[in-house]
C-alpha cells in the first residue's frame, strides 16, 4: 500500500503452556488420625488468565510411614486441555512414631475368700495407659496366664510378668509395661463352735476314773459345711492344761491351724476310784487282849496302798 506494492506471508505458532501441578508435602507424629493436605501448587507456565482446574486430593497416611499425596484434577470448562502440557507431581505424607514413652500399667485383679473346702479363683487384669496417649489395649497382646485357683487357706499368685505383654503397634516406639501381679487369698475359717456360721461342732471328751495313768482324752471336731472330721495337728492342735493323772478337772485348749483359726476349750474330769476293804471274821474267849483279824483291799492301783 502507499509507496509499496506486492505481498508475502508470515506464519507464527501458539505453543502449549507447560503446567506443573504439585501436591503438598506434610509430616506429623502419629496420633491415630489420618494425615491429609489438600493443597495443590500450580507451577511452570501456570494457567492462562481466568483459566484453571479443580482438584480432588486423595492422599492419606495414618500409620507410621510415608506415602504419596495423590490427587486428580479436572480442567474447568473454559480451559482446553489441548492448550496445555500438564505434569502431576505427588508430594509426600509422612507419619513418624510417637516419640514419648507410653506407660501401660497392668494391675492383676485380687480377691479374698474364706475357706470353704471348695475351689476359688480370680481371673483378669485391669489396664491403665498414659493420660493423653492414643495407645489402646488393642495395640498389645498378652501371652501369659491371668487366672489363679486355690482351695486351701493361703495366698496364690497369677504370675503376671512384663514379658507376658508385647507391643504390636509400630506407631509407638517406646512402650513400657508396668505389672502388678494378681492374687487370690483364702483366709482360714473360725474353728469355734460358738460361731454358728462356721458350722463347726465338737464332742465333749469323756470323763475318766483315776487309774494312776495319764488321761489324755480325745474329742472329735467336725466341719459340717464341708462334711469332714478335722484332723489333729493338721487342722487343729490340742493342749491339755492341768494334772492329767490325778483326780480333778482337765482343760483342753483347741487351737485352729491350717485352714482354721481361733480357739475354744473343753473340759473333762478324772473322778476318784472306788476300792473295797473286806475283813476276816474271827472270835476268841476273853483274855484281856485285843482280838484282830486279817482282811483284803480290792480296787487299789498296783504300787499304791491304803492303811487301816
Feature locations, PLM:
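Solvent-exposed beta-strand/loop surfaces, strongest in extracytoplasmic domains of secreted
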Residues: 1-308
Amino acid at each position: 500500500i502507499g509507496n509499496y506494492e506486492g505481498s508475502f506471508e508470515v506464519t507464527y505458532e501458539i505453543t502449549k503452556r507447560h503446567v506443573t501441578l504439585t501436591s503438598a508435602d506434610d509430616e506429623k507424629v502419629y496420633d491415630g488420625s489420618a494425615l491429609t493436605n489438600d493443597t495443590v501448587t500450580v507451577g511452570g507456565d501456570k494457567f492462562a488468565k481466568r483459566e484453571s482446574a479443580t482438584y480432588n486430593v486423595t492422599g492419606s497416611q495414618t500409620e507410621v510411614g510415608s506415602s504419596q499425596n495423590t490427587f486428580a484434577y479436572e480442567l474447568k470448562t473454559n480451559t482446553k486441555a489441548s492448550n496445555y502440557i500438564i505434569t502431576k507431581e505427588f508430594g509426600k505424607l509422612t507419619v513418624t512414631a510417637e516419640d514419648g514413652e507410653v506407660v501401660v500399667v497392668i494391675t492383676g485383679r485380687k480377691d479374698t475368700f474364706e475357706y470353704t473346702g471348695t475351689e476359688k479363683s480370680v481371673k483378669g487384669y485391669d489396664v491403665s495407659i498414659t493420660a493423653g496417649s492414643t495407645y489402646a489395649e488393642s495395640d498389645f497382646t498378652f501371652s501369659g496366664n491371668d487366672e489363679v485357683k486355690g482351695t486351701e487357706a493361703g495366698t496364690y499368685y497369677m504370675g503376671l510378668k512384663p514379658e507376658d505383654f508385647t507391643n504390636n503397634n509400630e506407631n509407638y516406639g517406646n512402650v513400657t509395661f508396668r505389672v502388678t501381679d494378681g492374687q487370690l487369698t483364702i483366709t482360714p475359717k473360725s474353728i469355734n463352735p460358738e460361731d454358728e456360721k462356721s458350722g463347726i461342732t465338737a464332742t465333749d471328751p469323756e470323763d475318766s476314773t483315776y487309774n494312776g495313768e495319764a488321761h489324755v482324752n480325745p474329742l472329735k471336731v467336725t466341719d459340717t459345711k464341708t462334711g469332714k472330721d478335722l484332723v489333729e495337728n493338721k487342722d487343729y492342735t490340742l493342749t491339755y492344761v492341768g494334772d492329767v493323772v490325778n483326780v480333778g478337772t482337765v482343760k483342753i485348749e483347741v487351737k485352729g491351724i491350717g485352714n482354721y483359726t481361733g480357739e475354744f476349750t473343753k473340759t473333762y474330769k478324772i473322778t476318784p476310784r472306788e476300792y473295797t476293804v473286806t475283813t476276816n471274821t474271827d472270835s476268841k474267849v476273853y483274855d484281856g487282849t485285843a482280838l484282830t483279824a486279817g482282811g483284803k483291799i480290792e480296787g487299789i492301783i498296783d504300787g499304791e496302798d491304803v492303811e487301816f
